[in-house]
């Protein structure tokens, strides 16, 4: 709660504190009202003293007003859009190529003045232009344009200068809350204080101390001091509450110290008490510091409105009033409108924009359309007075006049020494970097888990991987092992930073917001992030490479080891720079992190392939050789190879002939680079002949890698500074193609700019399409009475018990609406959850909760509707489909499908959703607006036709007054149809409050203060509270607000009365107890008979679910397939990844020859395919999370369908797309490489071609089910991806491609046997290269001379007959060219692959698929399903 107890009284009487000229923070005196840490802290006293001290010290506050004239704003829209799916997305390509845009005017001729120290409230319904107006004033104008003749004057500062050189002096604060979730509230706000801390600080207080204490002041000001050490959190990470997070957002903007502040619906999510406190704080800032502000508010309380100096009313982009706030009501009354009794002034002003709500006075003919209202305004005396005021302002403050120079000098005095005067930032660049580094350190300390996990993971992986090549000896048998080790080291170091893309993508909105506040350059944050990551990268690099280097016995000399570490570290840095660089443009063109990851994934494959190991330089095709030149991994790998081999000689392990005498001139070592007659092989010769590496390139390559690193980071900083993330479009209704209703037309008024949570789409319905229909089924509401007595809810916090609900009593009867109210934290939602039997958290619930005198059975949850505060819906479904889904699964099985569908249409008519029944739900920003979503939330519950009652949690929260009125209209209509409704409310207006029949009021601690009728004009309620209240309810007061003031629950109020005791000793309480006793004893006799009679047709209606499992499965699997089909970005990004990578590999290994190296290349072509598994898995996880969130939060508690159906349908949904992808990958990979030619040579083209496709199919099925296995038990997609990556690294390295089974230590053979990829590699290589002859390349022959008088064949006959191979010329007598392989099956046998096991291995892969499915279902039940008393 805002700390306004003392602020309120001092604001009302206009007095100021007597405390002046004292230490601005009270000298840390615990009893000083200037000390923010004191219990006596007084915000107004502190502000007064701070202003006094500042002015006495010779400093001034920057003050800024704004004058605007003839302000016009416009944007461009495209023709009517439709929902894209996998099939019709191609139809949109012509529209993408041909820009057919239409200009739409958003703001029409706005005029006004907001002087320094003035507050202006901006009123208007959704789509009226409030957001665009505030963005225009603050300079946040992405996505729309300002008319050339628009005039702006900021106290002599031009519009262009303000929004460049003084950008942070006029800020726009949106209603969304974006913060680093792992930072505490204190750290978040202290950072903001530091970013805008002035150069000269009063009383010589040290900078750090000043920022800390100023942060404490603001936290005390907004009532969040108790959250100082609590993490901010977000929707997924536990932290402060939603209301507290909103106040953190407000506090951060306050600390920006901007002279002009534009607040866009920043009170959303706050109750009226906190909204009033927020406005009072703005009033205090304006009064003492001269700050001016413009604030848009929905459901503004009267006491908040009274704090504003000026008001402007907007109506569909037209300004219909601008002037003194206390004269606005009189202006519209003179136009001919009447303000109803107890309607607040802001509600009255906003009602001018709703024809059905404004009341015309008798004898008047007032304006009706927005244009008529605007014309009336421009012809009014008030408008003429405004124009006169504007003319005087222009004369007094000419552009670039004396005032502008004064402001510039004042701003310069605020900036740090060395900062440019034209810079919008307060601190210098290096100060910004240092500040961001401190924040990065705080983020690391607050969340050390990832760093520890990465370090330990690196260490463990190093142990496992290096143990495969433990203690390699300096002989030629270790050549391949050393090359694999160095390749693995390079790959690990290079791609250790790939997940940085996800982290940086997530923080981009935070960085862009704070850059708009002029806290720091985005590049400064990027620079500090790089610097702060250096120690972490060093730690990660050392933890892996230290173990890896010495366990594998690489070149053990100090110089070579430290060179290895240096090269590895720069490889890490260079690749980190690349991933950071490509992240920025990816974010600019991508809506999701999964799409942004695709370029990184494809780049990984390119860099791995052209690192120089899998495809040596002399094997690279000319068309793609350039990739190697641009590849930092390739330069790093060459340097590490040179570091390992150069200047060394390796003892020969295998000779040709094998029985020859070492050192004999007719005997040669059987490796590339050997010289006949030598017993050692030169490392330089080996890498030169095998890889075309030159020892002179060792340090040159490091220089190139460093240069690339500098270039990559430079580009990263540049793009961070100038490239913004992709903005969402404005809200428009999107229909399925061909489903736009014929009797409606979509009028896309306004903007891509009102991209708030409110509509920019207006549905205009034809007269013949409008109906007032309440169907017969809807009229037959529930007959049962739900009642509860002595309900308590107890939990333990830090081992101490705490009671959340304290003996709550009440009932809900058919045909009535009961309001559940109370202060924040009173337990309203908790009570609703307990009554609805949906409380899954820890805690003990006691008390009676009965239906017609009977205990709730397991069918209770599906027989009640629960419209939650969060509007959770599947974004790809239409409104009608959402209702049909609920009706088919939640209504009893014996009811015909046609009847269920007909009832859905009745619900659509009742809720007046016909015009957008076939519109797609979408997401906030692109789809249904807030009101439409709220209607859909209620409609989904009604479609289930709950026979008992409907729970509704905060249906009006965050809505404007007119939308709230419409929602309550809906609830009242349902109530009149016989529905029982229990609804929580946040301090409604008087007119809204009177719509309810009964009230249950809770105080702190969940204690009942009142339960009973409200009465006509709230008379019954008022009469009860006036018995003990200090003051009676004034005639024009809002009874809901007066009631809270009476019990001491409103800001600045206290009460010495124990209202719970008053209630429990009142006659009303006794009557409640008597009625509860009567309901318990006689309720079942009067109400249960009819319900039992109606349900005798279906015994299962009393069961957990309304329909059988098979019916559940059919309906759910259809929706899951539908979701995938209507998410073309998800499907085509998967196809693009599969297609591009497989084609790339196919072309890189185009017509791979049947040489020794060619066989290795074809094996690597198989191994390269596996590089995309991680990305394929991470792509499907967010889709799963979307469905799972909806299921666990809404559908599972409602007993809509079984968890088994959910899991099976999710797993099956990917099969068709992976089946298509398998065909594409097979064709683009199998034929370019030339594997079909091998099958033709062997005469098995049909069988082996078909087997290869089946292997692709089985592999992709394994990938899909492996992803579900990993995400089934994980909380987030990121956690699932990390689990998948760790397991996949093990599966991949033990598949037998890089290291063969006979080279593995015996201990690790079990992992080779357990890896599904080992069976896949075996079958794919069998189908691809078995049963063909091998022809060595020129550099693969071992050349020796036979003894005098012998031919080559005579000399090497035993060698050929024993180990195989062949001679290029059997009859040659010198330069015998011996190839160690003649048949590919010998190559396969060396890696323990048998052609005869190909089909068996294919079957084993399917066993792993079945295992993944079983494990996914089992782990979901173990990790995610509530058990025992928590079962819902």
Curated annotation (Swiss-Prot):
Keyword hit for Electron transport: no
InterPro entries according to UniProt: AAA+_ATPase (IPR003593), ABC2_TM (IPR013525), ABC_trans_N (IPR029481), ABC_transporter-like_ATP-bd (IPR003439), ABC_transporter-like_CS (IPR017871), ABCG_PDR_1 (IPR034001), ABCG_PDR_2 (IPR034003), P-loop_NTPase (IPR027417)
Glycosylation positions in this chain: 265, 1017, 1371
Sequence intervals crossing the membrane: 450-470, 484-504, 530-550, 559-579, 597-617, 702-722, 1135-1155, 1166-1186, 1215-1235, 1251-1271, 1279-1299, 1317-1337, 1402-1422
Span list, region Disordered: 1-36, 1076-1095
Compartmental location: Cell membrane
Topology with respect to the bilayer: Multi-pass membrane protein
Induction: Expression is significantly up-regulated under xenovulene A producing condition.
Protein name, entry field: ABC transporter asL7
Biological source species: Sarocladium schorii
């Amino acid at each position: 709660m805002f700390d306004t107890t003392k602020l309120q009284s001092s604001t009302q009487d206009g007095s100021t504190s007597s405390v002046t000229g004292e230490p601005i923070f009270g000298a840390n005196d615990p009893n000083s009202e200037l000390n923010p840490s004191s219990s006596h802290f007084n915000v107004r006293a502190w502000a007064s003293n701070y202003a006094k001290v500042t002015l006495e010290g010779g400093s001034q506050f920057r003050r800024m007003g704004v004058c605007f004239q003839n302000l016009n704003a416009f944007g461009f829209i495209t023709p009517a859009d439709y929902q894209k799916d996998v099939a019709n997305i191609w139809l949109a390509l012509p529209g993408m190529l041909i820009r057919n845009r239409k200009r739409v005017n958003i703001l029409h001729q706005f005029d006004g003045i907001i002087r320094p120290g003035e507050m202006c409230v901006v009123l208007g319904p959704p789509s009226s232009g409030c957001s665009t107006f505030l963005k225009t004033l603050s300079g946040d104008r992405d996505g729309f344009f300002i008319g050339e003749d628009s005039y702006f004057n900021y106290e002599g500062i031009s519009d262009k200068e303000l929004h460049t050189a003084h950008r942070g002096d006029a800020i726009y604060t949106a209603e969304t809350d974006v913060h680093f979730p792992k930072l505490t509230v204190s750290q978040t706000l202290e950072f903001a204080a530091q970013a805008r801390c002035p150069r000269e600080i009063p009383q010589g207080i040290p900078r750090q101390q000043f920022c800390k204490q100023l942060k404490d002041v603001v936290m005390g000001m907004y009532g969040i001091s108790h959250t100082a050490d609590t993490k901010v959190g977000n929707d997924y990470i536990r932290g402060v509450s939603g209301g507290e997070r909103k106040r953190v957002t407000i506090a951060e903007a306050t600390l920006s110290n901007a002279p002009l502040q534009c607040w866009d619906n920043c009170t959303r999510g706050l109750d009226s008490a906190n909204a009033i406190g927020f406005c009072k704080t703005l009033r205090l800032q304006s009064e003492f510091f001269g700050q001016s502000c413009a604030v848009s508010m929905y459901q503004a309380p009267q006491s908040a409105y009274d704090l504003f100096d000026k008001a402007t009313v907007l109506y569909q982009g037209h300004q219909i009033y601008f002037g003194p706030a206390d004269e606005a009501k009189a202006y519209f009354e003179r136009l001919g409108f009447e303000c109803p009794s107890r309607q607040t002034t802001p509600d009255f002003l906003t009602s001018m924009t709703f024809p059905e709500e404004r009341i015309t006075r008798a004898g008047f003919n007032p304006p009706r359309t927005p244009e008529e209202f605007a014309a009336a305004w421009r012809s009014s005396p008030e408008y003429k007075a405004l124009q006169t005021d504007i003319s005087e302002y222009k004369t007094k403050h000419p552009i670039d006049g004396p005032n502008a120079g004064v402001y510039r000098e004042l701003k310069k005095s605020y900036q740090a020494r060395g900062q440019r005067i034209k810079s919008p930032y307060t601190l210098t660049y290096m100060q910004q970097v240092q500040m961001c580094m401190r924040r990065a350190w705080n983020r690391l300390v607050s969340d050390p888990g990832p760093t520890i996990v990465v370090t330990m993971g690196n260490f463990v992986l190093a142990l496992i991987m290096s143990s495969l090549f433990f203690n390699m000896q300096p002989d030629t048998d270790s050549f391949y092992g050393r090359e694999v080790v160095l390749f693995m080291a390079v790959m690990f170091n290079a791609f250790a930073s790939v997940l940085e893309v996800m982290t940086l993508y997530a923080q981009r909105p935070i960085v862009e917001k704070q850059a708009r506040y002029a806290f720091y350059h985005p590049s400064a944050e990027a620079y500090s992030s790089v610097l702060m990551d250096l120690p972490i990268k060093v730690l990660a690099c050392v933890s892996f490479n230290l173990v890896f280097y010495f366990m594998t016995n690489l070149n053990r000399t100090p110089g070579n080891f430290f060179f290895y570490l240096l090269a590895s570290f720069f490889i890490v840095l260079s690749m980190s720079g690349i991933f950071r660089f490509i992240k920025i443009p990816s974010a600019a063109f991508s809506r999701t992190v999964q799409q942004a990851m695709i370029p990184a994934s494809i780049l990984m494959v390119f860099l791995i392939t052209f690192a120089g190991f899998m495809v040596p330089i002399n094997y690279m095709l000319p068309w793609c050789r350039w990739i190697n030149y641009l590849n930092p991994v390739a330069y790093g790998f060459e340097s590490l190879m040179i570091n390992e081999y150069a200047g060394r000689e390796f003892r020969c392990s295998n000779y040709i002939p094998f029985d020859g005498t070492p050192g004999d001139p007719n005997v040669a070592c059987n490796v590339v680079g050997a010289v006949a007659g030598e017993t050692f092989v030169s490392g330089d010769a080996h890498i030169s002949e095998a890889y075309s590496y030159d020892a002179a390139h060792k340090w040159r390559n490091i220089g190139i890698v460093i240069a690339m690193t500098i270039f990559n980071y430079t580009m990263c900083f540049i793009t961070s500074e100038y490239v913004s993330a992709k903005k969402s479009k404005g809200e428009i209704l999107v229909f399925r193609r061909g489903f736009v209703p014929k009797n409606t037309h979509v009028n896309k008024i306004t903007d891509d700019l009102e991209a708030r949570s409110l509509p920019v789409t207006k549905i205009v319905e034809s007269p013949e399409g409008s109906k007032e229909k309440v169907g017969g089924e809807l009229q037959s509401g529930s007959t049962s009475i739900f009642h509860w007595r002595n309900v308590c809810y107890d939990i333990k916090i830090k081992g101490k018990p705490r009671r959340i609900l304290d003996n709550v009593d009440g009932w809900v009867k058919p045909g009535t609406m009961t309001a559940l109210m109370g202060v924040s934290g009173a337990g309203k939602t908790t009570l609703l959850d307990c009554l609805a039997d949906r409380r899954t958290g820890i805690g003990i619930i006691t008390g009676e909760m009965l239906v017609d005198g009977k205990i709730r059975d397991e069918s209770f949850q599906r027989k009640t509707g629960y419209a939650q505060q969060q509007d959770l819906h599947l974004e790809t479904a239409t409104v009608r489909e959402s209702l049909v889904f609920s009706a088919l699964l939640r209504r009893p099985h014996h009811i015909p499908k046609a009847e269920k569908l007909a009832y859905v249409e009745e619900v659509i008519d009742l809720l007046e959703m016909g015009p957008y029944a076939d519109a797609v739900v979408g997401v906030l920003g692109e789809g249904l607006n807030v009101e439409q979503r709220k209607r859909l939330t209620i409609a989904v519950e009604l479609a289930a036709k709950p026979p008992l009652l409907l729970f509704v949690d905060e249906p009006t929260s965050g809505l404007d007054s007119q939308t709230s009125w419409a929602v309550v209209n809906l609830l009242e209509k349902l109530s009149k149809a016989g529905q029982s409704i229990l609804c929580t409310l946040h301090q409604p207006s008087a007119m809204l409050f009177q719509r309810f029949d009964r009230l249950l009021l809770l105080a702190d601690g969940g204690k009942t203060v009142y339960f009973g009728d409200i009465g006509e004009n709230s008379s019954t309620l008022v009469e009860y509270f006036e018995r003990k209240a200090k003051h009676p309810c004034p005639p024009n007061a809002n009874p809901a607000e007066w009631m809270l003031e009476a019990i001491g629950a409103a800001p600045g109020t206290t009460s010495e009365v124990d209202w719970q005791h008053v209630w429990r000793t009142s006659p009303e309480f006794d009557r409640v107890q008597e009625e509860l006793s009567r309901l318990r004893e006689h309720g079942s006799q009067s109400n249960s008979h009819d319900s039992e009679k109606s349900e005798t047709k279906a015994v299962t209606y009393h069961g957990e679910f309304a329909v059988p499992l098979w019916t559940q499965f059919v309906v759910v699997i259809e929706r899951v397939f539908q979701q995938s089909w209507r998410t073309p970005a998800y499907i085509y990004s998967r196809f693009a990844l599969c297609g591009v990578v497989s084609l790339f590999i196919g072309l890189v290994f185009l017509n791979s020859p049947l040489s020794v190296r060619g066989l290795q290349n074809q094996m690597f072509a198989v191994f390269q395919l596996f590089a995309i598994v991680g990305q394929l898995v991470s792509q499907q996880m967010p889709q799963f999370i979307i469905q799972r969130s909806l299921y666990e939060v809404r559908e599972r508690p409602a007993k809509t369908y079984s968890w088994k159906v959910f899991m099976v349908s999710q797993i099956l949904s990917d099969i068709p797309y992976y089946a298509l992808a398998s065909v594409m990958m097979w064709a683009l990979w199998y034929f370019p490489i030339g594997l079909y030619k091998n099958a033709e040579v062997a005469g098995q083209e049909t069988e082996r071609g078909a087997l290869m496709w089946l292997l692709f199919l089985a592999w992709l099925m394994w990938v899909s089910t492996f992803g579900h296995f990993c995400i089934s038990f994980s909380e987030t997609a990121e956690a699932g991806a990390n689990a998948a990556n760790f397991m996949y690294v093990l599966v991949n390295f033990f598949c037998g491609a890089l290291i063969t089974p006979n080279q593995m230590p015996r201990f690790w053979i079990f992992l080779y046997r357990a890896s599904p990829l080992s069976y896949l590699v075996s079958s794919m290589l069998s189908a691809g290269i078995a049963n063909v002859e091998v022809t060595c390349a020129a550099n693969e022959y071992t050349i020796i001379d036979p003894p005098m008088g012998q031919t080559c064949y005579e000399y090497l006959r035993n060698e050929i007959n024993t180990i195989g191979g062949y001679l290029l010329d059997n009859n040659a007598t010198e330069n015998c060219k011996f190839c160690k392989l003649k048949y590919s099956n010998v190559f396969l046998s060396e890696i323990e692959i048998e052609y005869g096991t190909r089909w068996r291995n294919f079957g084993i892969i399917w066993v792993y698929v079945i295992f993944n499915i079983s494990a996914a279902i089992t782990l979901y039940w173990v990790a995610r399903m509530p058990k025992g008393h928590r079962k819902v």
